[in-house]
Curated annotation (Swiss-Prot):
Subunit structure: Homooctamer. Dimer of tetramers.
Catalytic activity: isopentenyl diphosphate = dimethylallyl diphosphate
Native organism: Bacillus licheniformis (strain ATCC 14580 / DSM 13 / JCM 2505 / CCUG 7422 / NBRC 12200 / NCIMB 9375 / NCTC 10341 / NRRL NRS-1264 / Gibson 46)
Cofactor(s) the record lists: FMN; NADPH; Mg(2+)
One Pfam family recorded for the sequence: FMN_dh
Gene Ontology MF, one: isopentenyl-diphosphate delta-isomerase activity
Assigned protein family: Belongs to the IPP isomerase type 2 family.
InterPro entries in UniProt: Aldolase_TIM, FMN-dep_DH, IPdP_isomerase
Organism taxonomic ancestry: Bacteria, Bacillati, Bacillota, Bacilli, Bacillales
HAMAP family cross-referenced by the UniProt entry: Idi_2
Protein name: Isopentenyl-diphosphate delta-isomerase
Function: Involved in the biosynthesis of isoprenoids. Catalyzes the 1,3-allylic rearrangement of the homoallylic substrate isopentenyl (IPP) to its allylic isomer, dimethylallyl diphosphate (DMAPP).
GO cellular component, one term: cytoplasm
Binding positions for FMN per the UniProt entry: 62-64, 93, 122, 184, 214, 258-259, 280-281
UniProt-listed GO biological process terms: isoprenoid biosynthetic process
Length: 349
């Protein structure tokens, strides 16, 4: 099967499998503030990922590219929506364009349609330093995402089976490229142990890519003759991943992703320690169902709803929201206790 056809299958299956509310974010409840002393018009949603300035913490996370006309049109629409709303946009893995120059336009269109905005490049952890540099140059990227997708690869019929040397390659890339490097999971979550190893080799930001959003095990199982369904429920939830990584990150930025679908999910993610949050599957559904203008309108609505939540919590800035008290219950509470992460840090601040 060609890489382009596989990319198209991924999009189709991502839309058909849907997202389940298994992010753990439903286990999170804010402590209500009856006297917030805030005004909606004074709320500042700006944030930073390292030295990159974002007007709001929402961005369009990596989805696709390298699948011919279909992915070209999707990326063009995503880039236009990002430009219209002033949020960053990430492209999907650029390996296909590095191997086949005919696929470059489906990625280059993102920068062409979003000349002044933040654009993130994307490659897998199998990439070399030279490939990383070419991916950044291809779209004049402001940041490089390196994705970790072991479960997807092991389930994928034609996927990788050798995962040795990945950390060393990531370290080499961090030392060599001219832009910040963020490492992201793709829906299976990240432990504090993995995050610590990545920070130690120079990774500037971690995108936890938690369980509960687009499920690449289910997607790849739809492409297999014999499914390996035990991986369909494999992973660490978005909420647990954020709390784990936040416990060791210090002042290094964390990015939330994995099933984030509304402003409340976004606010909870920030309060758990994220500086920004990427949304992919939800935005793809809005785009394919209602079009580019509807997507831009939905992004604007999300930002306004997010401001409302910050207002009632008494938070004028993202840094204040990161300190908002919340209570962790249910499976997320038990996971964190078992892992030695104190959930009461959040409720008693």
């Amino acid at each position: 099967m060609t890489r382009a056809k596989r990319k198209k299958e991924h999009i189709d299956h991502a839309l058909s499998t849907g997202q389940k509310r298994q992010t753990g974010l439903d286990d999170i409840t804010f402590v209500h503030v009856s006297l917030p002393e805030t005004e909606l018009s004074q709320v500042d949603t700006s944030t930073k990922i390292g030295e990159l300035f974002l007007s709001s913490p929402i961005f369009i996370n990596a989805m696709t590219g390298g699948g011919g006309k279909a992915t070209f049109e999707i990326n063009r629409a995503l880039a236009r929506a990002a430009a219209q709303t002033g949020i960053p946009v990430a492209v999907g893995s650029q390996m296909s364009a590095l191997k086949d120059p005919d696929e470059r336009p489906s990625y280059e269109i993102v920068r062409k349609e979003n000349m002044k905005g933040l654009v993130f490049a994307n490659l897998g952890s199998e990439a070399t330093v030279e490939q990383a540099k070419r991916a950044v140059d291809m779209i004049e990227a402001d940041m490089l995402q390196i994705h970790l997708n072991v479960i997807q690869e092991i389930v994928m019929p034609e996927g990788d089976r050798n995962f040795t040397g990945r950390l060393r390659r990531i370290e080499d890339i961090c030392r060599s490229v001219s832009v910040p490097v963020a490492v992201k999971e793709v829906g299976f979550g990240m432990s504090r142990d993995t995050a610590a190893r990545l920070f130690n080799v120079g990774v500037q930001a971690i995108d936890v890519g938690g369980f509960g959003g687009t499920n690449f095990s289910k997607i790849e199982n739809l492409r297999r003759d014999k499914a390996v369904e035990f991986f369909d429920q494999w992973g660490i939830s978005t909420a647990a991943s954020l709390a784990e990584v936040s416990s060791i990150s210090g002042d290094r930025p964390i990015i939330a992703s994995g099933g984030i679908q509304d402003a409340l999910d976004l606010a909870k993610s920030i309060a758990l320690g994220a500086s920004a949050a990427g949304m992919a599957g939800y935005f793809l559904k809005v785009l394919t169902a209602s079009g580019e203008e509807a997507l831009a309108a939905e992004i604007e609505s999300l930002i306004e709803d997010f401001k409302r939540i910050m207002t009632v919590l008494g938070c004028r800035t993202i840094e204040q929201l990161k300190k908002a008290p919340l209570v962790i219950k249910g499976d997320t509470y038990h996971w964190l206790k078992a892992r030695g992460v104190d959930p009461f840090v959040y409720s008693m601040r």
